[in-house]
């Protein structure tokens, strides 16, 4: 938007918009382009519908941080929660990062048709810190693991992440029907991460919840 009001100057290019709605670009705050950003700089189909900014990393799933050898675990989370075919993710995701700041650096090298923002997901954080075998289910994270998760969140937001997302709904399951990491994380774990974000004075906290008593 360059100017608001009656515009009398002629533009270099004018489009007849009679009968149409003219709006600023739409901001889609809930997308799952976390993998697609690796191979599609147009981010279709959002670019077809007036969207000029997308936010990914929702629902506690994503692809960073990731330890070498655990990539397929994150693919199975995304495939189960968002029904994005694992074969497409395995073919297209480049995996040339480990930390979330490195992930931002990797996608920052591309020239997208719209602005892209990302949140860091609880699932990747928990699997990175606790391991694939322990991050799902009812096992509680230790104080040291909780501190490490909070530090990873802090470093991600300082590097440019828009915030942190987690899923606490039983509707979200991985490819094999298991609850995603963080579904039953303790209040202590959630408070530590939330307080870390609050201390930063920036960043959002997104929780997809079934509104159980603990929440």
What are these regions (language model features)?
Residues 1-25:
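Histidine-rich, glycine-flanked metal-binding segment
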Residues 34, 61-65, 124-127, 171-176, ...:
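Flexible loop/turn segments at secondary-structure boundaries
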Residues 39-163:
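Divalent-metal coordination cores built from histidine and acidic residues
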Residues 101-112, 138-215:
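Histidine/acidic residue-rich metal-binding segments in metalloenzymes
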Residues 21-45:
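Di-metal (Zn2+ and/or Mg2+/Mn2+) metal-binding site signature of metallo-dependent hydrolases
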